[in-house]
Amino acid sequence: MFGSWVPLALFALVVWSIQRVVTKVALIRWSTARFYRLNAVLSLGVYAVFAIAVPPDPGGVVGAVGLSLLMAMTFWVTTEATRRGPVGVVAPLTAMSPALTVILAVAILGERISFEHGFGISAALAGSVLLSFRPRAPQALAGWLPLALASLVLQGLGAFIAKVLVTASGPTDLLVTSAAVQLIVGLIIARGEPLGGRELLQGRGLATAVTLVAAAVATIGYLSALSVGPASAIVPLVATSPALGGLLGILAIHEAVTRRQLAGIALGGFAAVLLATAA
């Protein structure tokens, strides 16, 4: 019997996987800053509508703001670690962050892991590492390892804190504050970029906008699932989205693929099925 959180988590997994492919195509034409700003604007709009139906909890605002700032810092740390270090080591290392979330959920929240559950988590982590691994990388700059380790800790800790916050106060506080922080950052880094409103009304621009709106809805589903379900299952489950996204990239935009990537995709898909059915 599926837990009540499983459909929400699977919806997030599928939509975020599609978003990865759409993002890849969009960034061929748009700058990262412009895309970041657009995502923030559309997400905040979706979350504002959701907040009307599910009002925020004033008692959870402080924690949500704190986590939103932590998420912004995590983004910078991860980006800087990637810039300085060999991506072939940094990416697989940070892909292990769900393991920390699982450890915290078991140790602090008392969540239990079955054999099937544990096997699914292991497969998800192995798939993430295989998908992230790159055997060749440019010369690393000093200080990348502490940053990569900090990124791992911040990502794993952030997912755990999100579980605690949404369980206590619901998802609305975190949704609105995180999008607001993202919008502020987006307006700053994309201040010289065109708005391109007309471009969003047709063709690929419209497809991108619709996908980002769907991704925002998926985030609502993910945090709603996290508020009622086990973080030790949900976080590793949605962390398999690169596997499905990679498969979609191969099929939809004919990206090149290696045996290592195929193995990672297979492991990720297997992990997603195992984690969902073990719920």
Q: What are these model-derived regions, one by one?
A:
Residues F11, R37-L38, L93-M96, E116-F119, ...:
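Hydrophobic core positions of alpha-helical segments in small-molecule transporters
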Residues M1-L69, F75-G85, F133-L147, A180-T211, ...:
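Membrane-interface interhelical linkers
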Residues V41-Y47, L93-A107, V181-I188, A218-T219, ...:
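Alpha-helical transmembrane segments of compact multi-pass small-molecule transporters, enriched
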Residues F2, A142-V176:
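Selected transmembrane alpha-helices and immediately adjacent juxtamembrane segments
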Residues T78-E116:
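Membrane-interface helix-loop-helix junctions at boundaries between adjacent transmembrane segments
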Residues T32-Y36, L174-L175, I234:
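Juxtamembrane helix-start motifs in multi-pass secondary transporters
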Residues L42-Y47, V102-V106, E116-F133, R260-A279:
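Hydrophobic transmembrane alpha-helices of multi-pass small-molecule transport proteins
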